[in-house]
């Protein structure tokens, strides 16, 4: 898969359960000053009539900051989902889920705006986004 289509990511993405529809509020797990992120769209979703676009681990979304620093609020930021509460199946057959939904703010190339991530990052996300993997404290 070409780097151009995935916005600075590497490798192929496997299908996982999508647990975050448009309108979901997720935690912001980096040190940019944002507390939460409100998902307004999902990158790469074509969609079907009346179906809400949904995101899963490793997906890039467009989000706004609802709580956090005033300079981050009232703007649209690209973000990547790093954890989701909805269980998803890995290729080895194990089902995995996290205790919260979380994302990190990135730029259009997939480089993080912050410099640290709180909590674990899903392996699926770390494989797709090398800049996020390098800032992750732990990869689960």
Swiss-Prot record:
Broad class of where this protein is predominantly found: cytoplasm
Coiled-coil boundaries: none
Source organism, top-level taxon: Eukaryota
GO cellular component: cytosolic large ribosomal subunit
Keywords: Cytoplasm, Ribonucleoprotein, Ribosomal protein
GO biological process: translation
Listed InterPro entries: Ribosomal_uL14 (IPR000218), Ribosomal_uL14_CS (IPR019972), Ribosomal_uL14_sf (IPR036853)
Location(s), subcellular: Cytoplasm
Quaternary structure note: Component of the large ribosomal subunit.
Similarity comment text for this entry: Belongs to the universal ribosomal protein uL14 family.
NCBIfam families: PRK08571.1
Function: Component of the large ribosomal subunit. The ribosome is a large ribonucleoprotein complex responsible for the synthesis of proteins in the cell.
Protein name: Large ribosomal subunit protein uL14
Organism: Danio rerio (Zebrafish)
Source taxonomy: Eukaryota, Metazoa, Chordata, Craniata, Vertebrata
Gene name as annotated: rpl23
């Amino acid at each position: 898969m070409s780097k151009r289509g995935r916005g600075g990511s590497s490798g192929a993405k496997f299908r996982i359960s999508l647990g975050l529809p448009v309108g979901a509020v997720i935690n912001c797990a980096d040190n940019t000053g944002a507390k939460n992120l409100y998902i307004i769209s999902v990158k790469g979703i074509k969609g079907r009539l009346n179906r809400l676009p949904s995101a899963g681990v490793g997906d890039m979304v467009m989000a706004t900051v609802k709580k956090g620093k005033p300079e981050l609020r009232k703007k649209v930021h690209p973000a990547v989902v790093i954890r989701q509460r909805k269980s998803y199946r890995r290729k080895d057959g194990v089902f995995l889920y996290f205790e919260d939904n979380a994302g990190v703010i990135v730029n259009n190339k997939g480089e993080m705006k912050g410099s640290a991530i709180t909590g674990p990052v899903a392996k699926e996300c770390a494989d797709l986004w090398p800049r996020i993997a390098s800032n992750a404290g732990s990869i689960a």
